[in-house]
């Protein structure tokens, strides 16, 4: 099906382009969302009349998105979740969770603006891309941790997936422990004799 794009769509085209897409993609997504029109003579004439208005509206949305992007780009958000000793979460962090955290910080971000291929299931730092506008994309850091103090340590670059790192255990290697035990045993034998 041939359609006229009403806004820039990644991997498809710019506003005003006439492109050919699969019928289902046009009928189920592009046309209902108001992102495209069927490419017939009547719609082509209508689009040419409305082109200036559409461009002005697009520029306005883009400038609003850029203002938000300046404030939000590169920010870090902490997500506290329960997890096992290996760092595996009891549950996951999805686009809904990320949207709620960013919204609670005072920014209006919808779930559909977050590009996350699959839910986050382990603790760590994740770079997430947000599409505020088809032409404005930014990145934020999501810090998934078991506690706020752990998130701070993680942000400083510490790896927190081993038991030693989680509980701040400072164990000596097994060989050193074995030598100390042998020295202690030898001393106790000498004392008994």
From Swiss-Prot:
Keywords: Ribonucleoprotein, Ribosomal protein, RNA-binding, rRNA-binding. Residues 184-193 have a biased composition (Polar residues). The keyword Zinc-finger does not apply. Signal peptide: none annotated. Residues 155-193 are annotated as: Disordered. PROSITE patterns: RIBOSOMAL_L9 (PS00651). InterPro entries: Ribosomal_bL9, Ribosomal_bL9/RNase_H1_N, Ribosomal_bL9_bac/chp, Ribosomal_bL9_C, Ribosomal_bL9_C_sf, Ribosomal_bL9_N, Ribosomal_bL9_N_sf. One of its GO terms (molecular function) is rRNA binding. GO terms for biological process: translation. Gene3D superfamilies: Ribosomal protein L9, C-terminal domain, Ribosomal protein L9, N-terminal domain. One of its GO terms (cellular component) is ribonucleoprotein complex. Binds to the 23S rRNA. Belongs to the bacterial ribosomal protein bL9 family. NCBIfam families: L9. This is Large ribosomal subunit protein bL9. The gene is rplI.
């Amino acid at each position: 099906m041939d359609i006229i794009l009403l806004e820039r769509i990644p991997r498809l085209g710019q506003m005003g382009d006439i492109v050919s897409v699969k019928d289902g993609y046009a009928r189920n997504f592009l046309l209902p969302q108001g992102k495209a029109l069927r490419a017939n003579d009547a719609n082509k004439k209508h689009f040419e009349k409305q082109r200036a208005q559409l461009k002005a509206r697009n520029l306005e949305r883009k400038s609003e998105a850029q203002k938000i992007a300046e404030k939000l780009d590169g920010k870090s958000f902490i997500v506290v979740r329960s997890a096992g000793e290996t760092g595996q979460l009891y549950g996951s962090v999805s686009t809904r969770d990320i949207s709620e955290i960013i919204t609670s910080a005072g920014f209006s971000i919808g779930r559909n603006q977050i590009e996350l291929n699959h839910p986050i299931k382990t603790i760590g730092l994740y770079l997430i891309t947000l599409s505020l506008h088809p032409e404005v994309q930014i990145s934020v850091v999501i810090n998934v941790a078991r506690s706020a103090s752990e998130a701070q340590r993680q942000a400083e670059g510490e790896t927190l997936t081993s038991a030693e790192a989680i509980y701040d255990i400072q164990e000596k290697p097994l060989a050193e422990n074995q030598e100390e035990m042998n020295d202690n045993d030898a001393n106790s034998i000498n004392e008994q004799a």
